[in-house]
Amino acid sequence: MLMLSHAHEVPRAALRGIPTPDPTDTWRPVPHTDVVDVLTERAGARGLRITSERFAVLPGYLYTTPGTTVELPGARLFGSLDFAPIAGMPFPPGCTPSAGIRNSHDKSFALSILSGARVLVCANGVLSAEFVVSRKHTSRIDLVESVDHALDAFMESVRGFQALHERLGSWRLTRTRASALTVEMARAGAFSSSDILPVLDEYERPSHEEFEGRTAWSLYNAATARMKAQSPSRQVDGFRALNTAPLAQAS
């Protein structure tokens, strides 16, 4: 679901080679490989079958003592797991359920699971919600329990995606309304003001014929297409802002 621009993409096996900093009395970083393995295991227990996966890392920095900074290779993990259709759960055609992962070894952000979807024709991401697994862990048992809670919330969030798709797909937009909504998305922080015209250009002349309809769903995808160029961290903030904008909130 996350689009991994500006990060170094790596295979799952490479995550095992990324060192994890030593824990302290108040903070225990979670190895990236443990996060991915536990999420895969617990998702499988729910009948979620992974169809594709991508992982990317960025370096980070840890302040160990006053005036001392240590660079940590691969400290920030971003991942995306796409799942096969879920039995008994309606999902829009041309989309697949998807989960994002964020984890850091430099305290830059908490371990979290992101729920959403991927639009197959263009690989655009759609983020519905973010669930913080935990800000610190003491054992693998705690990690498993926390991931289970996050996956429960993920499943509930994914159930609502069909309604979002139907609502946006049935909302016809005039050119004036589309322009106003795009400005509001930028104002909410989904993307910068310099992206307003490129988003409108993609909406009016879409790269994929599936989005030629003048609907809010087409505009949403024009926005997320532009957001592919953002860094993974910025995308999470951007999606969060996008979901508070009038486009996603209107009933």
PLM regions: where:
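N-terminal low-complexity, intrinsically disordered segments
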Residues: M1-Y63, T69-L72
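Intrinsically disordered, low-complexity regions enriched in serine/threonine
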Residues: L2, T69-S251
